[in-house]
A protein has these predicted regions:
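Surface-exposed amphipathic alpha-helices with a cationic face
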Residues: 178-182, 240-255, 301-309, 362-377, ...
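Active-site mouth loops of central-metabolism enzymes
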Residues: 60-66, 188-206, 260-271, 318-329, ...
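Glycine-rich, proline-tolerant flexible connector loops at the mouths of alpha/beta enzymes
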Residues: 218-240, 349-356, 422
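N-terminal capping/small domains of soluble enzymes
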Residues: 2-207, 211-213
């Protein structure tokens, strides 16, 4: 027993004033949604800018003393030539930004939208290449976000001409290519994530891989992002050896359906290229990484593998993105992930209640738009609806995509909804989770539910019970405690 008075206090309270608490309790998601709605409304009424020699960036501004137009001039000054006035037609002039236009939001003239043009002359390299790292280095630098004059700034949109968009490599495959190389046709594409997330040996992981790879429901299987490639108990090279063996061992159970397997390779820049080469040498047809703490990593992998006959599919994981999206809109980051070469990109599933993960609402719609819209010949990304996707909301998501863009550009990616379902012995049994997902898909195909309401989970559970869909009934009971 600890000596009285020496126990560590784990719960304490500090009394704060109502004013401080009110500021701390601001609903930032609600605020972001309101700002985004107004920004897009304003943008829709602006004239199309001249993009022949510049990219045009839209910022939302909340300043202390300057108008949005004046803030735009400061951004141009600090982040382009650093010259207030340049000789017309000079090289200096060609490397100096311009304010295109501005819209004030109130009579204080301190809040609004401004569009700033950044010259291509100062952004392109000597080979005529353009890089997202350089674009963000300039358009989202400290001369934008670090100035104390600016209470809050958001980078909302970057407009580029088709000629500029074609300077980027884009996805090697995208959704159409992924379906082609796996012989998936127009079937619904499901994927799963290996669990446990970490703390397993290559031998243990191989058994989990074999279970998933044997199931022709899945077009895609990936490691979890928590399973770092350099851990001593499971170094990547050993994992690849065992993964290959596991996939080969069960390949005859897949019929004519291919499978993309993506090991996790996120690593520091001086190591990452070696990780990519290791995967290529091992014959891996996919890799997964997040670049938000390693700038430019997606483009690096794309460039490193572009001359291969069959480059690996890139699952551009978005781990770390939310630390940026209060200032750089997520849809802008997703656009550049597509341009840099990501083949898969997570958005988020629709759910029957509050979303587990961002994005949602208008942000979510714009992300899916940027990942799939016509883009100077670049293929659409295969969007992974993941993060809480399960048997209870899969029909909602299938109905949504069927009534919208169609299933072709979507991967329905479930982790714990497959690998976290237990059998009657209390053991985790991915086969039950996968079968439950297959049964939910069949319920959708049978047209049992044409719309989803508040009672959907209970209604689906009742239908599963009445029709002998034991796996689906079990999964819903465990996921929703019903």
């Amino acid at each position: 027993m600890p000596i009285p008075g020496t126990e560590r206090k784990t719960h304490q309270m500090k009394i704060l004033s109502a004013e401080v608490l009110n500021l701390m309790h601001i609903d930032l998601d609600k605020r972001e949604a309101l700002i985004r709605d107004v920004v897009y409304e304003v943008m829709s009424g602006l004239d199309a800018p001249d993009l022949s020699d510049q990219i045009v960036v839209t910022y939302w501004i909340n300043a202390q003393t300057l108008t949005p137009a004046e803030v735009g001039k400061e951004i141009s000054y600090h982040m382009t030539s650093g010259v207030r006035k340049s000789p017309p037609g000079s090289l200096l002039d060609q490397c100096t930004g311009r304010v295109i236009d501005a819209v004030d939001f109130d009579d204080t003239h301190r809040m609004g939208v401004v569009r700033v043009g950044f010259p291509l002359k100062m952004l392109m390299d000597e080979g005529g290449n353009l890089y997202s790292t350089d674009i963000f280095h300039i358009t989202a630098g400290e001369g934008v976000f670090g100035l104390t004059e600016n209470i809050d700034v958001k980078l909302c949109h970057i407009a580029m001409s088709d000629d500029v968009l074609r300077l980027f490599p884009g996805p090697a495959y995208g959704a159409p290519g992924i379906r082609q190389i796996t012989n998936w046709g127009d079937d619904v594409a499901f994927g799963t994530i290996l669990k446990p997330c970490t703390g397993i040996t290559p031998e243990e992981e191989s058994e989990i891989i074999a279970q998933a790879a044997a199931n022709p429901l899945f077009i895609f299987v990936k490691e979890d992002e928590n399973y770092l490639p350099g851990v001593p108990f499971a170094p990547l090279k050993d994992r690849l050896t065992h993964a290959n063996e596991a996939i080969r061992r069960v390949s005859d159970q897949r019929g004519d359906k291919g499978l993309i397997y993506a090991p996790h390779i996120t690593a520091p820049p001086h190591i990452l290229a070696d990780m990519v080469k290791m995967c290529v040498d091992a014959g891996m047809n996919g890799v997964m990484l997040s670049e938000y703490f390693i700038g430019g990593a997606i483009r690096m992998v794309r460039e490193l593998t572009k001359d291969l006959t069959n480059p690996p599919v890139i699952y551009a994981h978005n781990g770390g993105i939310s630390v940026r999206t209060r200032h750089i809109y997520r849809e802008v980051l997703d656009l550049f992930t597509r341009l840099d070469g990501g083949d898969f990109r997570q958005t988020a599933p629709l759910t029957n209640g509050s979303s587990l993960l961002r994005p949602f609402g208008v942000e979510w719609k714009h992300c899916e738009y940027e990942l799939s819209r016509p883009l100077a010949g670049h293929p659409p990304v295969m969007m992974a609806r993941a993060g809480g996707l399960d048997q209870g909301n899969i029909i909602l998501n299938l109905l949504d995509v069927a009534n919208g863009a169609g299933i072709a550009n979507y991967l329905f990616l479930a982790g714990s909804a497959v690998n976290g379902i237990k059998n009657p012995l209390g053991e985790y049994d991915p086969a039950i989770g996968a079968e439950a997902m297959r049964q939910a898909l069949q319920v959708y195909r049978d047209g049992v539910f044409t719309r989803i309401d508040a009672s959907h989970i209970q209604d689906l559970k009742s239908y599963a019970y009445q029709n002998g869909l034991q796996a689906l009934s079990t999964a819903l009971a465990q996921r929703y405690h019903i």
